[in-house]
Amino acid sequence: MHVKKKLISLMLALGLLGGTQTAFAAEAAPEAEPLPAWSYGMLADGYSLGLFGDEIYTQHSQTVTTEQLDTMTKVVADKLALLEMETRPAADEGLVIDTTRGGVVNALYQEAAAYAFPGIEAGAEEFMTSVGALAGDGSSLRLEEPCTLLEAAAMADSLILNLYDQQNAGSLGLLWKADNGEGNTLYLLGSIHTDVNNTYPFHKQLRDIILNADQVTFELDFNDQAQIAEFAAMQVYSDGTTLADHVSPELYQATVKVAAQLGMDEQAIAQYKAWALATSLQSLATLDETTSSNAMAVDLYVNAKAANAGIPIDAVETYAFQGGIFDNLSPEYQETYLASGLLMAVDVNTVDQETRDALVAVLGEEALEPATQEAIQAQVDQISAMMETWKNRDVAGFEKIYDKEAILESDDELNSKLFIDLDPGMIQYAADYLSQEGSHTGLMVVGAGHMVGDTGIVQGLIDQGYTVEVVPNP
């Protein structure tokens, strides 16, 4: 519940489409200091790993605090444990841990020294230097100087990435390569719009493909502030009405109660449309204990990585187009959608009677039965299973879990629209990129569901004569 409380206001704005801003905020953010150019390359990785949050923009030149260092060493410890390396006896004798550069080096080295990494016996300075986690100014390592937050974050980030690279580890992603046989290549990365199951770090192969692209294309342009503002406006009522005017009084009160448990007041909730609340509640249900406090979905990470590297960004659709799919859902569907989101957010064994009655009125008595609760948990588990296939580049496994044909054949108003309305335009965009003159290498990042199936991008390009293959695992 702690993670959900922390993220509810953010996710209400992000929803499943991602990249929007919240329509309200508790307070204005402090003015940011310019970051040094050398740090741009590590920001997306450090943020996604949870090494730091937005404080990096205002505190990066300040001496790292003990609490911040503790957070970083915990992240390093958790990530290195996932490599399942052979353990070794503790090697912390004589290591002084403080907030100097040397103290930070020792703290990070101590976490790596729990495992039999090659060269670990050389000691803190030599090992950290050998894996690219420690560098000086050309004359010395400046170990006695205070360590800034940014320096500490860069050390921790480099340590994790280099040790993962050394072990050929990291998330591979559902990745295909399409080419026209005449010099144009388009990598296709199927995204899953969540951050669970230790998504980060990405494997070096995938990070390199991002950084070597001439252009990166997403479903939406996460950097277009005008479009983001337009989408944010679509999520709230602008005709003088509130949520209370569009759903039953009982469902409205149930929504207010659940939102209060997640840290939002009635005034904030009332302005949002039912579909915006529903997508947010269902997204929150997919988060787990592995989700970084920054909860950076795959497409948002790739966007940050590419944008920080100065790579041109493009988009297949507009926020208005995709938002319109949700905005045009029937009132009846939106009410059911919201009730379903609430059902995923509450504990039916402890929820108050009024909320139970409100959910039953919309969803029926079976909504509160054990079988339904088991089905909901199965859906959440399915997200986790899909993420495992994503991390391992198991396309067949993903397609087995994600039955696109069943979705297309269903009478669900939303699911079918998300593919019927979007797949053709995505196929055309990819084909246009591949058919342009010259030699180009691009990366297209859209929902994995759009990649697969008979109507998906991969098959659509094959049908047009392009060569499309799953990228071999490194």
Model-identified regions with their sequence ranges:
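Sec-dependent N-terminal signal peptides of Gram-positive bacterial secreted proteins and lipoproteins
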Residues: 2-25
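Extracytoplasmic Gram-positive cell-surface binding/anchoring modules and repeats
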Residues: 26-77, 86-122, 134-159
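Extracytoplasmic/secreted envelope proteins and their assembly/folding machinery
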Residues: 40-43, 66, 70-74, 101, ...
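Sec-exported extracytoplasmic/periplasmic mature domains
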Residues: 48-51, 74-82, 109-113, 129-133, ...
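A recurrent domain-boundary module in secreted/ectodomain proteins
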Residues: 149-166, 469-474
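Catalytic cores of RNA-modifying enzymes
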Residues: 171-173
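Structured, acidic catalytic/metal-binding patches in enzyme active sites
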Residues: 177-414
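A cross-kingdom marker for long, charged
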Residues: 407-474
